[in-house]
Swiss-Prot record:
It is found in: Cytoplasm. NCBIfam families: PRK00197.1, proA. Pathway: Amino-acid biosynthesis; L-proline biosynthesis; L-glutamate 5-semialdehyde from L-glutamate: step 2/2. The keyword Cytoplasm applies. SUPFAM superfamilies: ALDH-like (SSF53720). This is Gamma-glutamyl phosphate reductase. It comes from Salmonella typhimurium (strain LT2 / SGSC1412 / ATCC 700720). GO terms for molecular function: glutamate-5-semialdehyde dehydrogenase activity; NADP binding.
Length: 416
């Protein structure tokens, strides 16, 4: 089954690569319209997925990721329309010039070909990835988690209907709708057809892909994100940032999971933090110093060492008091996932040092980690957030779905 999907996707990719920006945008507009027109069928499938997931004991954080509402689906359709408004990188001449040999050389952006994406309970990923791949002239094979296979299947049927209406092969966007996990292993070996693989899920999935895939893999999306409250931090705006970073949508990978507090501000800052977190319903996981300083009103439990590597994806927050900037940076290097980390400070020397020494895809000064997102960065919907350094890093927008080719123009030009 998968080989036939691969053959069809590769054939579709050749046709997609030749489309003009206008043709691709018309397809995306049609997809957005169909998502709204077929909303009832998608939501009906999603209700079944959510009910099954709840019966299987899926956590509330995961259920939130899985659930669609009319408003969320409308927002997804609007995101597709936003992709239409983005500049098409395909065909862009990155650099080049006339060589001494007389050869005129260009380095031009081109589609990757076929992209494979493996993801878990995030039905919005289906549309986000499909729209970005189509905008960049790539075909895509999607493998969502078993928790979302009804939703994904319904969504892909809608996308394929739009493709067909625009005279394009339905195989441009395909989904593996069989939840059998063995198909993941088969997909990882489809290097003959898939040019790049993007896993979006937990550490186990990323490890499997790194170890078993014969396809180039871009990993990311695991966010043990940190905020360091420096000794010079202004407490009121710092609390506002922390509330946003923790509570706006706790199930996302750019949510803060560990708060590092400079010891010189701890006694003034921690009580204010506790009050704010109590109002926000956040449970604090405190180290020894925190446990000694705080006695309410927020719910407080002793921090377990293994929790420092946790992506809670819930209203839980580690709080650790560190001696100084060195301690904060060392902690992030040991426990961070190179996703998103922030410093809250009024000392711009410390801010500059933090930015230079924390090796993460996104580093913030006096801002929430929640900004690490393709839409917030002006990239449109994102394929993933890469925490590695090759071939992309941070939110992966359109350019991350392209490669380049060298094109030489001559006039009977030969090498001397």
């Amino acid at each position: 089954m998968l080989e036939q999907m691969g053959i069809a996707a590769k054939a579709a990719s050749y046709k997609l690569a030749l489309l003009s920006s206008g043709e691709k945008n018309r397809v995306l507009e049609k997809i957005a319209d169909e998502l709204e027109a077929q909303m009832e069928s998608i939501l009906s499938a999603n209700v079944q997925d959510v009910e099954q997931a709840r019966a299987n004991g899926l956590s509330e954080a995961m259920l939130d990721r899985l659930a669609l509402t009319p408003a969320r689906l409308k927002a997804i359709a609007d995101d597709v329309r936003q992709v239409c408004n983005l500049a098409d990188p395909v065909g862009q001449v990155i650099d080049g010039g006339l060589l001494d040999s007389g050869l005129r050389l260009e380095r031009r952006r081109v589609p990757l070909g076929v992209v494979g994406v493996i993801y878990e309970a995030r039905p919005n990923v289906t549309v986000d990835v499909a729209s970005l791949c189509l905008k960049t002239g790539n075909a895509v094979i999607l493998r969502g988690g078993k928790e979302t296979y009804r939703t994904n299947a319904a969504t892909v049927r809608v996308i394929q209907k739009a493709l067909k209406a625009c005279g394009l092969p339905e195989a441009a966007v395909q989904a593996i709708d069989n939840p059998d996990r063995s198909l993941v292993n088969e997909m990882l070996r489809m290097d003959k057809y898939i040019d790049m693989l993007i896993p979006r899920g937990g550490a186990g999935l990323h490890k499997l892909c790194r170890e078993q895939s014969t396809i180039p893999v871009i990993t990311g999306g695991i966010g043990v994100c940190h905020i360091f409250v420096d000794s010079s931090a202004d407490i009121a705006p710092a609390l506002k940032i922390i509330v946003n970073a923790k509570t706006q949508r706790p199930s996302t990978c750019n949510t803060v999971e560990t708060l590092l507090v400079h010891q010189d501000i701890a006694e003034r800052f921690l009580p204010a933090l506790s009050k704010q977190m109590a109002e926000s319903g956040v449970t604090l996981h405190g180290d020894e110093t925190v446990m000694q300083v705080l006695h309410g009103p927020a719910k407080l439990v002793p921090l377990k060492p293994e929790e420092l590597d946790n992506e809670f994806l819930s209203l839980d927050l580690n709080v650790v008091v560190v001696e100084n900037m060195d301690g904060a940076i060392a902690h992030i290097r040991e426990h961070g996932t190179q996703h998103s980390d922030a410093i809250l400070t009024c000392d711009m020397h410390n801010a500059a040092r933090f930015v230079n020494e924390v090796d993460s895809a996104a580093v913030y000064v006096n801002a929430s980690t929640r900004f690490t997102d393709g839409g917030q960065f002006g990239l449109g919907a994102e394929v993933a957030v890469s925490t590695q350094k090759l071939h992309a890093r941070g939110p992966m927008g359109l350019e991350a779905l392209t490669t380049y080719k060298w094109i030489g123009f001559g006039d009977g030009t030969i090498r001397a």
